[in-house]
Amino acid sequence: MSDSPIKYRLIKKEKHTGARLGEIITPHGTFPTPMFMPVGTQATVKTQSPEELKEMGSGIILSNTYHLWLRPGDELIARAGGLHKFMNWDQPILTDSGGFQVYSLADSRNITEEGVTFKNHLNGSKMFLSPEKAISIQNNLGSDIMMSFDECPQFYQPYDYVKKSIERTSRWAERGLKAHRRPHDQGLFGIVQGAGFEDLRRQSAHDLVSMDFSGYSIGGLAVGETHEEMNAVLDFTTQLLPENKPRYLMGVGAPDSLIDGVIRGVDMFDCVLPTRIARNGTCMTSQGRLVVKNAQFAEDFTPLDPECDCYTCNNYTRAYLRHLLKADETFGIRLTSYHNLYFLLNLMKQVRQAIMDDNLLEFREYFVEKYGYNKSGRNF
């Protein structure tokens, strides 16, 4: 895939770590890396408008193939002119393959060489997703970056199961490449699996790199393993991937995990965490996690985070946010979601600057101490 529509340009390597400052060029524009990608599951980042996402510095967003296939349907989106036009977003979009959603429906799925049979979570009907179908759906959606269909084995699965799984994922990746109808305007990433087994990660990476994908995702992490186990897997996995292609760590959004991923050479991250916790009034701030719904903030007329210059923090107080959330007002969720997304996007901006200044390890130490990870154990 040497004429890939997705290009990675390395700007600088950090002197003391594996961190890389760069940019990714796509048919819908260029974004700087390392980058956090807000998740727009149903072709919308919950409660946020496209204009707000641009305003907060989101260079790319993610949408879910599985959910859009079921509703409203990929063919309908194709008739609308593709996902960008359908949702009025003119910047890059990444779509997942649907594999993780199917994996999370563990009770109702059956995996064979052909693909996966499972129950539609909306109406209980029987569905079948194959590597070819996953690619076809994404071709209809028209995302800039697509994912190969993979199986995401649990981190603590037995070795023999994981070995069979990664070998099947490699065969599925090859089938997906052959089925790809739009290689000139949609890049396709391969997904490295292997749970916590170094030799299986090596085998998976070797298989996929030989297929020359536009970029490589690291899957099967943030699924219940410890923070230390994830870092250990990243330590050896990123080194197996080409220097001239993007590296994407799937499903990771806790602030320390983002920094630790960057230190180990990852360029892209996504997670529903910032919007999911915002709906419960949990906010990430420069001083750590804050649950603004708590009674102690009822008469707190200070900004959510005095060090943050986002729209929420510039205009509203903790007391007002608490009132909105307690009254079940959607505006409260909009404001906390905006802040959390801005916080992670701004964190990545600070990380990019730290790479430029060759002081990423010092920045990590400063951030972790201030955020309170050292005081209360690890907590997003």
UniProtKB/Swiss-Prot annotation:
Coiled coil: none annotated. The keyword Coiled coil does not apply. Keywords: Glycosyltransferase, Metal-binding, Queuosine biosynthesis, Transferase, tRNA processing, Zinc. GO terms for biological process: queuosine biosynthetic process; tRNA wobble guanine modification; tRNA-guanine transglycosylation. GO terms for cellular component: cytoplasm; cytosol. The active site is at D96 (proton acceptor), D270 (nucleophile). It catalyses: 7-aminomethyl-7-carbaguanine + guanosine(34) in tRNA = 7-aminomethyl-7-carbaguanosine(34) in tRNA + guanine. The keyword S-adenosyl-L-methionine does not apply. Binds 1 zinc ion per subunit. Belongs to the queuine tRNA-ribosyltransferase family. Its EC number is 2.4.2.29. Homodimer. Within each dimer, one monomer is responsible for RNA recognition and catalysis, while the other monomer binds to the replacement base PreQ1. Zn(2+) binds at C308, C310, C313, H339. GO terms for molecular function: metal ion binding; tRNA-guanosine(34) queuine transglycosylase activity. Its cofactor is Zn(2+). The gene is tgt. It comes from the Bacteria. Pfam families: TGT (PF01702). Substrate binds at D96, S97, G98, G99, F100, D150, Q193, G220. Catalyzes the base-exchange of a guanine (G) residue with the queuine precursor 7-aminomethyl-7-deazaguanine (PreQ1) at position 34 (anticodon wobble position) in tRNAs with GU(N) anticodons (tRNA-Asp, -Asn, -His and -Tyr). Catalysis occurs through a double-displacement mechanism. The nucleophile active site attacks the C1' of nucleotide 34 to detach the guanine base from the RNA, forming a covalent enzyme-RNA intermediate. The proton acceptor active site deprotonates the incoming PreQ1, allowing a nucleophilic attack on the C1' of the ribose to form the product. Pathway: tRNA modification; tRNA-queuosine biosynthesis. This is Queuine tRNA-ribosyltransferase. Residues 251-257, 275-279 are annotated as: RNA binding. It is an enzyme of class 2 (transferase).
